[in-house]
Amino acid sequence: MDKIVLESCRFYGYHGAFKEEQTLGQIFLVDLELSVDLQAASLSDQLTDTVHYGMVFDSVRQLVEGGKFILIERLAGAICEQLFNEFPPIEAIKVAIKKENPPIAGHYKAVGIELERQR
């Protein structure tokens, strides 16, 4: 299956189980892998034959920066639901969300989750 990929999209949001996360906010890194049939676009060179990744980015930004979820698992689920609703050609989605600086002690690059959903 063909794919459209958006990597390390950076957004500022107020999601998390800790009070500090909900009030101070933090950076969220979002990776998306969208399964889309790109056959027509690969032949036509027409934007109408694909999913516009700029519009995908804006849709995800609205959710991450405008919404508020306790769990990033729920945020990822909401991203999948919204993208399926807005972009009918998307057949499957893999979304990963990472926090680089959650309020937990320890040494790590990031913590996060990954979901895969199909229509």
Curated annotation (Swiss-Prot):
GO terms for molecular function: dihydroneopterin aldolase activity. GO terms for cellular component: cytoplasm. It is an enzyme of class 4 (lyase). Keywords: Folate biosynthesis, Lyase. The active site is at residue 99. Its EC number is 4.1.2.25. Belongs to the DHNA family. This is Dihydroneopterin aldolase. It comes from Streptococcus pyogenes serotype M6 (strain ATCC BAA-946 / MGAS10394). The gene is folB.
